Each structure stands twice: as C-alpha cells, then as structure tokens.
Amino acid sequence: MRIDAIDXA
C-alpha cells in the first residue's frame, strides 16, 4: 500500500 492510500483510508 502507498502512504497516501493508507492516509485516505
């Protein structure tokens, strides 16, 4: 997973 994907979750 990408940092932005985790942050958006």
Curated annotation (Swiss-Prot):
Disulfide bond positions: none
Gene Ontology terms: cellular component: cytoplasm
UniProt keyword annotation of DNA-binding present: no
Cofactor note: Has high activity in the presence of Zn(2+), Mn(2+), Cu(2+), Fe(2+) or Co(2+) ions. In the absence of metal ions, there is no activity.
Subcellular location: Cytoplasm
EC number: 3.6.1.1
Name of the top EC class for this enzyme: hydrolase
The organism's place on the tree of life at top rank: Bacteria
Key words of the record: Cytoplasm, Hydrolase
Modes of activity regulation: Inhibited by ATP, fructose 1,6-bisphosphate and 2-phosphoglycerate.
Gene Ontology molecular function terms on file: inorganic diphosphate phosphatase activity
Cofactor: Mg(2+)
Catalytic activity entry: diphosphate + H2O = 2 phosphate + H(+)
Family: Belongs to the PPase family.
Subunit record text: Homododecamer.
Protein name as it appears in the record: Inorganic pyrophosphatase
Organism, scientific name: Blastochloris viridis (Rhodopseudomonas viridis)
Source lineage: Bacteria, Pseudomonadati, Pseudomonadota, Alphaproteobacteria, Hyphomicrobiales
Gene, per the UniProt record: ppa
